[in-house]
Every structure is written in structure tokens, then in C-alpha cells.
């Protein structure tokens, strides 16, 4: 959260009504990307989250059979998107992370790490599974980037929500 508060270069958001009336490609959060150009700045703060993610990813591959379907060594991370969502805002549109015609066509898996607890609302909701994942500090959620994992970020109703999201790509 301190990383976000000290970040000067983040993208601003729209109001909830403006976003609902706009193109579905517009987001209603504030975010910045930690990538190869600036990761050294964030490395010490993000290192423990990435170590925890690596353990969760190995568990995910074992539990789902992804280890036999894919060579796990063929996965690599993309940029880390760190988001701040204000109360009653967020990206409420049902979507998948693997859309035709976008740069994300090679996305295989999505992962999110919740950076704070949200008492009311703020869940990641999966349409076809009737499942809502409540934000808890350090909780890691991993899912396939394509159908049927249609999902949305529900608005936090009490307090702000901080989340780190990234994508696992398959090396060509």
C-alpha cells in the first residue's frame, strides 16, 4: 500500500456511472505497472509476495493437473499491475483475460494477490461458478485466462481495495 501511495505515475479512473456508460475497456481503478523498467524500485517490497506466489503456483499446477498439461518451465510472468480501488468503484464488467485481437492472446493464467482486507464487498466474482473470493491480505487467487472463467471485480463497499494482478504467459 505504501508503494501505491508513493507512486506518482498512476492512471486515474472514472466515476462509476461514467464507467458504466463508457466502453467496457475503461477501468475504474487507479493503477500502475511494475515492469522490467522499474522493478528494481519495487523489488524489496514485492519479493515476499512473489516468493509466496511461486509456492502457490506450484501447488496450483499440482492440484489442477496443469503440470502434466504444460511444461511449467514454459510459463513466464508479465508486468505486475498494482491497483487501488475506492469504495463503490472497480471494474464491474464481466470479462475474461484472453480476448481476441488484444496483446493478451498468449495469456494462459491470471493471478491476483490481495494486499489488504476488505470487510464488505470487493470480491473477485466468477460468473459460471457462482464463486466470490473475499479480499484478505496475502490471499492468492490463480485461474485460467479464458472461458469459462468469466469474472469481475465487485466494488469494495467499506474502505479501499489494493490488489496486485499479473498474467502467466506461455513461452512460444
Summary of predicted features, one role per range:
Residues 1-140, 148-172:
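Fe(II)/2-oxoglutarate oxygenase catalytic core
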Amino acid at each position: 500500500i505504501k508503494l501505491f501511495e508513493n507512486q506518482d505515475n498512476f492512471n486515474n479512473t472514472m466515476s462509476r456511472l461514467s464507467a458504466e456508460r463508457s466502453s467496457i475497456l475503461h477501468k475504474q481503478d487507479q493503477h500502475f505497472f511494475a515492469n522490467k523498467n522499474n522493478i528494481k524500485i519495487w523489488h524489496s517490497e514485492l519479493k515476499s509476495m512473489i516468493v509466496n506466489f511461486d509456492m502457490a503456483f506450484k501447488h496450483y499446477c499440482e492440484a489442477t493437473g496443469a503440470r502434466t498439461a504444460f511444461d511449467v518451465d514454459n510459463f513466464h510472468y508479465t508486468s505486475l499491475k498494482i491497483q487501488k480501488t475506492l469504495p463503490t468503484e472497480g471494474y464491474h464488467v464481466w470479462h475474461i483475460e484472453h480476448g481476441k485481437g488484444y496483446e493478451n492472446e498468449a495469456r494462459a493464467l491470471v493471478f491476483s494477490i490481495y494486499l489488504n482486507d476488505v470487510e464488505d464487498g470487493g470480491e473477485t466474482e466468477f460468473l459460471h461458478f457462482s464463486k466470490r473470493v473475499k479480499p484478505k491480505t496475502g490471499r492468492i487467487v490463480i485461474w485460467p485466462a479464458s472461458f469459462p472463467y468469466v469474472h469481475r471485480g465487485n466494488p469494495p463497499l467499506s474502505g479501499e481495495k489494493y490488489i496486485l494482478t499479473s498474467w502467466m504467459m506461455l513461452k512460444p
